Amino acid sequence: MWRFSGRRGLCAVQRLSCGRVHHRVWREKSDQACERALQYKVGEKIHGFTVNQVTPVPELFLTAVKLSHDNTGARYLHLAREDKNNLFSVQFRTTPMDSTGVPHVLEHTVLCGSQKYPCRDPFFKMLNRSLSTFMNAMTASDYTIYPFSTQNPKDFQNLLSVYLDATFFPCLRELDFWQEGWRLEHENPRDPQTPLIFKGVVFNEMKGAFTDNERIFSQHLQNKLLPDHTYSVVSGGDPLCIPELTWEQLKQFHATHYHPSNARFFTYGNFQLEGHLKQIHEEALSKFQRLEQSTAVPAQPHWDKPREFHITCGPDSLATETAKQTTVSVSFLLPDITDTFEAFTLSLLSSLLIAGPNSPFYKALIESGLGTDFSPDVGYNGYTREAYFSVGLQGIAEKDVKTVRELVDRTIEEVIEKGFEDDRIEALLHKIEIQTKHQSASFGLTLTSYIASCWNHDGDPVELLQIGSQLTRFRKCLKENPKFLQEKVEQYFKNNQHKLTLSMKPDDKYYEKQTQMETEKLEQKVNSLSPADKQQIYEKGLELQTQQSKHQDASCLPALKVSDIEPSMPFTKLDIGLAAGDIPVQYCPQPTNGMVYFRAFSSLNTLPEDLRPIVPLFCSVLTKLGCGILNYREQAQQIELKTGGMSVTPHVLPDDSQLDTYEQGVLFSSLCLERNLPDMMHLWSEIFNNPCFEEEEHFKVLVKMTAQELSNGISDSGHLYAALRASKTLTPSGDLQETFSGMDQVKVMKRIAEMTDIKPILRKLPRIKKYLLNCDNMRCSVNATPQQMPQAEKEVENFLRNVGRSKKERKPVRPHIVEKPTPSGPSGAAHVSGSQIVRKLVTDPTFKPCQMKTHFVLPFPVNYIGECVRTVPYADPDHASLKILARLMTAKFLHTEIREKGGAYGGGAKLTHSGIFTLYSYRDPNSIETLQSFGKAVDWAKSGKFTQQDIDEAKLSVFSTVDSPVAPSDKGMDHFLYGLSDEMKQAYREQLFAVNHDKLTSVSHKYLGIGKSTHGLAILGPENSKIAKDPSWIIK
């Protein structure tokens, strides 16, 4: 996977009762792993490693142990933390000097077989032989990293063995290079009369990646700001350069870069460090000697004057104004990221400059009305050896490029003169406090990503993690010098000659030109071939296809057994109280580390149909337009000072027992430090009772940003949009999902953003408020420590009494409403005490599914495809069989057909909670052929040509998802949102265990390929003459 983006924050944080609730005592979190790690002594020798440093990091509840390998110099960092989701990663500094994508192709190819595990594609096979909670590999601009995580010690050893052998002793077979990188092959490999074309997984992945104009801009920005070494090239590979890469170059790059002397090992969690060190030393490092490295990235020579560049990109067919599609940014080179305090300071400074409506650049650029949103890669980017800061606008007219540049310069001058308000600095420091306290389910992955760039350039990763000391030093600098930040702005922005202005505008013939250049490259390659070369290519193509079609013996790979899966799941204690009379509130006591997580769900049942399409917009702007006596700037300031964020999102929640029944509503979510709970709940009261809908100009700004974000997201999430569209006519909930989140919503927002007079839309917001922001059909939930629960009860009670109810009873718009209580009592939900939550579901007894085939013609060189089938709801025993079948079809058929043979970046099958079975592909050079592969996959499933071993592997893969760790903030959410008790989930678990060969073939025949009315199809991608001629397709 190619990764290209700026460094994110440490732990991105997006996000009196009738029956008195009885809270249970919660055992304090054990610090056993941290205490154990503190016993290590500096200089101690352990399995070929020497301990160099042992440092407690109390703010993150961990102990850091730094080691080095005696023979090879390999670096090692272990973060001991009482977290059972343990993680390993190995990282290599990879510094390509051309755009052939050699580190990216190598990342793919090393995972295709190794000395100890010579079977083809052990990486994908291990996805089905493990209970991993994460497995992947990523290529960044200057490093390649291979992480995995699991909660099972035996699984950790298995995966570690496979990862070590793959990275240090890969086979690197030529056929694997052909498959994963690039190859010349006949369009139909079995017919030498068909034309030769370029194929390959990475080749197609990068063609897809560069359909994203934001990515094109970000890539050029880095290449042109840092032009003198490795950052001047495309590490993932330029599709026009990838065909220059040879197999020999690939092997040479591995020999020079994938060596322990150039490696950084990282482990995290509560497993014993000694076991990791022993295995890594014995299976890999003991077989190497130290190698002098030559991979260091030199400092970029600084310019003596600013530079300007202009580039082109593809047209955006969903842009709100065709005359305003230009992007411009001004970027500044900053110091080395290994100066951790300077990097910390500049990262904070970047947030002060660009984050939220109170920031100087938001006021100067976003609110100027010149564009739709900030330019890509805005803010501080710490992924390269020297960081950079970038700011600008997208969606502007070409004539306004100079104006934007002048606004940037003027804003810098104003900041130097006026500085920042104390409240804004405090709000930012408060955000960091929340980020260090909030616990994610994949904290190890967050940490390895956070330290990767700094450590890659020999910075101190432990220093980077010591947020507390960085904050103390930052406060000290501010106290000693009130102009500390202004001087940084003057130093790094005003007086910095290493400054780049980059502008980009669409060219209607951009993709045509790209295709032409690819055609010329192809002709050049083909014309240089002798008849013997062509014959060899034909034979190699047949050989590759034979290899891909051959049954693979994976017996050499380690594997867990189904018996290694825990037979039962841990149950979560929940208490349901009634507040303000009869409003259910779910209390879930958890070790939340001093944080409180509040959620409220409000029904949309009474909302008139004409308002439904703009519910997502209402949700998006509700917390951004002001409330009560606060204008939108003051509201943003209070949200930042008192909470970790307040979000509002539309939700369509399918019923667990009826396909045509669902719950519709809006989820309000927020989090805060315990001390700020009264302030957070007061903010919610003001948002519910007194939201402001008068700020027309700011509303326009928010509409344009929302429309731009939706348009920009299509190239990254095209398969999700295709699946939503394909399921639109299969269930009533699918239709509403498409309205809220699919291409229908993208089109709605495009239309609204194009309106010259936006008042008619603004006037609809108070109407939605009237139906939604009341207690009529609401339920709430709180996740907090047991000690905090009495205070939380009191605050939620006050909130609900303040919000009140509608003055008159409103009837549901859709007449068929079913009241469904959540399970309770010893038989239904023994771990839930107190009252019940009663959900009001919409049902449509007259609904008839029908087939719809839609092709969204977009200017992309690749396709995103979804085929959906209506099956059964969650509680039906067949759902578990279909869940296993989806994984089985992905691993044993679709992966080979769509990725290996077809060259798509991804593809497979999945089953949603709502009973929609989806076949999909991602960044796919094919369309009709892929739909045919979907049909063959169904035939394969019906034939039952799979073994008990295949079924067991599919179960392991499904359980790795079912048992993935849940953060304390999210415990009990399945019960709160979907009405699923732990007993119901345990019953489903037992159904998964009980799936067998007969059940799998039975559900294949029963649901897949049985009739058009239960099928939907959608494709996002380029024009297609075959589809255009087929009247059964709707062309958009």
Curated annotation (Swiss-Prot):
Effect the entry attributes to changing residue 546 to K: In strain: LG/J and SM/J
Active-site residue list: 107 (proton acceptor)
InterPro entries: Metalloenz_LuxS/M16, Pept_M16_N, Peptidase_M16_C, Peptidase_M16C_assoc, PreP_C
Disulfide bonds: 119-556
Cofactor binding, note field: Binds 1 zinc ion per subunit.
Localization: Mitochondrion matrix
Alphabetized SMART domains for the sequence: M16C_associated (SM01264)
Annotated GO CC locations: mitochondrial matrix; mitochondrion
Signal sequence bounds: none
Keywords of this entry: Acetylation, Disulfide bond, Hydrolase, Metal-binding, Metalloprotease, Mitochondrion, Protease, Transit peptide, Zinc
Molecular-function annotations in GO: metalloendopeptidase activity; zinc ion binding
Disordered: region residues: 806-833
PTM notes: A disulfide bond locks the enzyme in the closed conformation preventing substrate entry into the catalytic chamber.
GO BP: proteolysis
Entry binding sites for Zn(2+): 104, 108, 205
Pfam entry (one): M16C_assoc
Coiled-coil features, chain-numbered ranges: none
Family: Belongs to the peptidase M16 family. PreP subfamily.
Assembly and binders: Monomer and homodimer; homodimerization is induced by binding of the substrate.
Protein name: Presequence protease, mitochondrial
Organism the protein comes from: Mus musculus
Originating gene: Pitrm1
